[in-house]
Amino acid sequence: MSTLICSFDGLHDNRVLRYYADFEAHILHMDTQTEAGEKVSVHFTGLLAHWFENVVQDNILFGMDEISVDAFFEQYKDLLGGAISYGFPACCSIEELRDRMDREHIRVDSSLGLCGFVLAQEVELQCP
C-alpha cells in the first residue's frame, strides 16, 4: 500500500513568505512565492495541530505531500512518543489520535526544507 496520497507540485521550491495559525478559528495560512515571483497561498482548515522545525527567514519548500495515517505514525513515532503525554498534538493517547484522524478524515501534509507537518481536515492552494 502506498503511503503517498497526493503531492502538491505547485509548491516545489517556493519561498515561504509568512505563515500563521489561528487556533480559535482552527486554520493555518501560509503564503509562498514561486521562483518566477508568483504568489501561492496554502490554507488549512479544521486545524488540529502543526509542527515545524528549522524555521528561518527565507525557508524554501521542497514540497508538500499528503501521506497516509500509517505513514504519519511511522515517520513521527519518536516525536509523538515523547510529546503525546504533554498534550501534543492532541490531548489524548496515540490510539485515540489515530482513531480521531480516521474518523474526521484529518489530512496529513508534510513540507520539507521547512520540515514538519500540519494536521488538518482540508487544504486548499490559492493562486491569484
Short names for language-model regions:
Residues 1-128:
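Surface-exposed, interaction-prone regions used to assemble/regulate multi-protein complexes
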